[in-house]
Structures are given as C-alpha cells and as structure tokens.
Amino acid sequence: MSFDKLLQALPPPLPLPAILIATFIFFFSCWILHQSQRNERLPPGPYPWPIIGNFHQVRLPLHRTLKNLAEKYGPILFLRFGSVPTVVVSSSEKAKHFLKTHDLIFASRPPTSVGKYFFYNFKDIAFSPYGDHWRKMRKICVLELLTSKRIESFKHVRQEELSAMIHSIWEESESGRIAVNVSKAISTSLANILWRILARKKFSDNDLGADGKGFADLVVEVSIAVGSLNIGDFIPYLDCLDLQGIKRALKKANARFDAFAEKMIDEHINASTIRNGEADAGCHVKDIIDVLLEMAKNDNTGAKVTREIIKAITYELFSAGMETSANVLEWAMSELLRHPHAMKKLQQEIESVVGQQGTVKESDLASIVYLHCVVKETLRLYPSLPLALPHESLEAVTVGGYYIPKKTMVIMNLWAIGRDPSVWGADASEFKPERFMQMEENGIDLSGGQSDFRMLPFGAGRRTCPGSAMAILTVEFTLAQLLHTFDWRVEGDPSELDMKEACATKMPRQTPLLAYPRLRLPRCP
C-alpha cells in the first residue's frame, strides 16, 4: 500500500473544539486523580465528573440532599461544584472545628454573582469577603445600628404595627367566619415594622415601581438567586454566557431597588436639612438611614460610608429581618396548630403573666418561659437559613484529620445539625418545645458564640448574624400577640396540615398558612 493510500485510509481528523474538550477532560481527570493521591487526606465524598464536578447529584431541596449524602459519607463531606472544592458540615461537633477552632481561617465568603451584581460589588456585610471593609461594616452594625439601646428606641413601632396587624386579621376574617392568610398578615406587619425602623415610614409596593411587583417579590427574586447554584460562579469560563439568566435577573432587581433607595436617601438628606433649623430637632428619633448618613457625613470611624454602602446595608437589614422572621413565625404557628396542646399551654402561660384583660408588652416576654421554648424548637427544626451562607477558607488547613485546601467553599447544613439524633435523640424530627424546659436553667446560646453548637440558627463565630437579638425579640413578641388575642383552628384535622417546604434559600412554607381566628378576650382587638 502506498503512503497516499495509507493516509486516505486513516479516519478524518477531529474538529478543534472536540480536541480541546477532550484535552481538558484528560488533564482535569489527571488533576482529580493527583488530588486524591496526594499525602493530605481529603474528606470522603462521591467522585466528581469532569468539568461539572458533583452538579449532577444536586437535587432540591438541597439541604435534604446534602443530609442524605452526609449519612452515606460522613459529617464532613467533600464535593466539587465545577472547579470549586466544597465541604459540607452536618454535625454540631464538626461545625465547632470550623466555626470556633479555625474561625478566622473560615471567616471569608466565596465570590458570588449576588454580591457582585445586587450588593454593589460586595458593599454589604453578609456577602463581602473577609477584610477591612467587612470588619468596618460589621463594627458599624454591632456598635451603631443594632445596639440594645437602638432596638429599645423602636419599641413603640413594634407595638403599634402588631396592634394594627391584630385589627387587620379580625376585620379580614369577618369576626372569625373566614380563614385569613396568616403568612401574608405576618409578612406585611414585619415589612411595616422594618421600614419604620430603617426609614421612619411605611412604603407600599407602588413605591418600588409601577410594574406590579412589590417588596415581597423583590426579596423572593434575590433569595432565589442566593439559593441557586449559579454555574458561572463555579465554572468561570461559562460565566459570560449567563446560562441560567441569574446575572440578568440580579441586575434588573438591583435597578428597581436602586431607584427606590436613591429617592429614599435624598428624602432623608432633605428632611435632615430642615430639622437642623428647628428648635426641637433633638427630640427626633433617628432611624437607621439617619445614622448611616450621619456617619457618611462625619466619617469619625474611618469606614467611609458611601451611598452604595447605605443602599446595600439597608436592603440587607430589610430582607433578612422580614423573610427570616416571617418564615420562623409561620412555621411556629403551623406547628402550634398541629399540636393544640402546645398552643393551649403557651396561651395559659401568657395569660398567667399578663392577665386575661392585659396587653402583652415586650417587658413581659422574659417571664414567659414556654414561649422561649416554642421559638427555640421552631428555630431548631426550621432555621432561618437551612444552609448557612457559604464560608471560604483563607488558607489550607487540617480539620478533623482531613485536608481542606485554600479557597474551599464550606457549607454548614444548619437544618441537619438541628435534627441530629445523636444530639437531640430519636425524636429529633418531632416538635417538642418541652425539651428546652430542661435547658432553660443553663440556657442555650442560639448564636453559637460560646461553646453551644447544638443548634446554629443564626450561624456562629465571626460571621454570626448581628441582628439575631432583634429577630428573636420580634418573633417572640409577634407570636405572643397572636396567641393571647386569638384561638386558632384550621380546616379539617390539624394533624394533617400541609407542612411541605418551598425549595428556597430560607425555606418558607410551600403554601400560605390559612387559619380561622376566634377572639379569646372579651373585647375587640
């Protein structure tokens, strides 16, 4: 056979893209093999596919999928999302290693589209990486915005808005004849409370724009983006394609909020100018935006508070305060409706503290022990975030005998930690507030700030939620008002109440909670 004929007999050459893909897969597989054979021992986990890693094993709801994988591979689970090494922690004992022993190493956040495109290139607190900006913003939050004194100064706001909610529920139910949307009543009241704290006034959905989408829609849109595993965040060369449309959605959502926030800031600046010329300006109770604008003007902290920072922090405080508290309240009400004996016990204890004719005050809450137990049990079963916002390792470290590479994304499965039977017993998935009665003497630190990592509804360590005290106060006060004023029932057997979760970052109910109120007190609410 001649050389020319031999060449003709060969198969046609592969196109260049196919060669490049095959080459990438080969080298990626070799790299994965090298990683698995290195001296440092990575945590156990399923083998990743080339390019996509373990994306093919992701199912919704993600916190349940990760719990199932942890049951197979262990409480420190290693995955790879695209090119990003990822560790999932599903036990309180292991969480302590990451969030206390090695807290500083895991104090950062991985870069995400949400922080870049919605929060003005990481000008917020929750999504910003560990560094000078985060430290200064965190300090402002803890020492200026969310102090005990500041929270106390808005006591009248919470009282007024919750009283308005009670009246609204009674009117909407037509004196108990019609089921009311408890979920909507709670979220509306919380939104009003938060806007009055943040900006001294309530806003309607029309204030956000004329497209029919309101603040609740905006919060849901951003929350969906937070909970989505955006392919571009994990496979960088696909980021420009925006395959899931997440970047477009975030930019659009940011534009809507930005126009509203700019107007709100300008109104505050104008109002401040007018107040400065008035004799009684000192009587004015500053809202959060007032405080931030004052810091931007005086710059005594060296934090250099810009308009973008004010907008990012304002939205973050609003969305975190509204969505997380609303979810906890609707799950608490759902569980109490399913367990009438627990509802009755809580109502009796509230009545024993404030009296049948009395009105619940925030100062009464400390004496209502069973209320604390109900809220803690709800947070254990339904943490405000089932999966905590991911951490990122600033350097390589060995944790629990496993090697954790630098820039590893670390996810705390708070939902799994709160339901760990080795900590909470065989009935870990059941709603039993009484389990906390035995712990009340010594207390249980919900923030994980000391040594208690049995449940971490607000995270732990440097990245713990700075607004947890205000959130717990608001949840307890709202729940006490709802139960002291009304008896509640649902259609049909309460034990059969639909308890399905929506597949979202903050795990709300899949369907709104509908219930019938009946006035308990011999007077109109």
Swiss-Prot record:
Places the protein is found: Membrane
UniProt keyword annotation of Heme present: yes
Membrane topology of this protein: Single-pass membrane protein
The keyword Iron is assigned to this record: yes
UniProt-listed Gene3D superfamilies: Cytochrome P450
Binding site for heme: 465
Gene Ontology CC entries for this record: membrane
Domain of life: Eukaryota
Gene Ontology terms, MF aspect: heme binding; iron ion binding; monooxygenase activity; oxidoreductase activity, acting on paired donors, with incorporation or reduction of molecular oxygen
Major subcellular location class: membrane
InterPro entries listed in its UniProt record: Cyt_P450, Cyt_P450_CS, Cyt_P450_E_grp-I, Cyt_P450_sf
Keywords: Heme, Iron, Membrane, Metal-binding, Monooxygenase, Oxidoreductase, Transmembrane, Transmembrane helix
Cofactors named for this entry: heme
EC number(s) reported in the record: 1.14.-.-
Membrane-traversing stretches: 13-33
Uppermost EC category: oxidoreductase
Record family assignment: Belongs to the cytochrome P450 family.
Protein name: Cytochrome P450 750A1
Source species of the chain: Pinus taeda (Loblolly pine)
